Design a protein with these regions (language model features):
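Canonical RING-type zinc finger of E3 ubiquitin-protein ligases
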Residues: 30-39
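Cys/His-rich, Zn2+-coordinating zinc-finger modules
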Residues: 3-12, 16-23, 28, 44-98
Length: 98
């Protein structure tokens, strides 16, 4: 079923639990707003509302297409190349949000 969502959805990578910090912001002494996790390599980085937009930079630099929120109270995923927002479908799967 997930193949129909987009060709990038199933990454074949089992992401570890996300970290509680943006790994790149910590290196440069900056701050972040929300955190995202790459579903292709597991790196935890900051969102586009953060000053440095590290997750989008990561996507552009290495081409990893899928990320998810790393916020503890949220559950969604984003595909960069297809610009698709995925949410849980209520049956243990995923659906494209309208």
């Amino acid at each position: 079923m997930t193949e129909a969502l987009c060709p990038h959805f199933d990454t074949g990578f089992e992401a570890p639990p996300p970290k509680a910090v943006c790994e790149e912001c910590v290196k440069i002494g900056s701050h972040w707003f929300h955190l995202r996790q790459c579903l292709n390599c597991g790196q935890t980085l900051c969102c586009d509302q953060s000053p440095n937009k590290h997750m989008t930079g990561h996507n552009r630099a290495v081409g990893h297409p899928m990320m998810r929120t790393a916020q503890p109270d949220e559950e969604w995923r984003w595909c960069y190349p297809d610009e698709l927002f995925f949410i849980p479908d209520g049956d243990g799967g995923w659906e494209v949000a309208e």
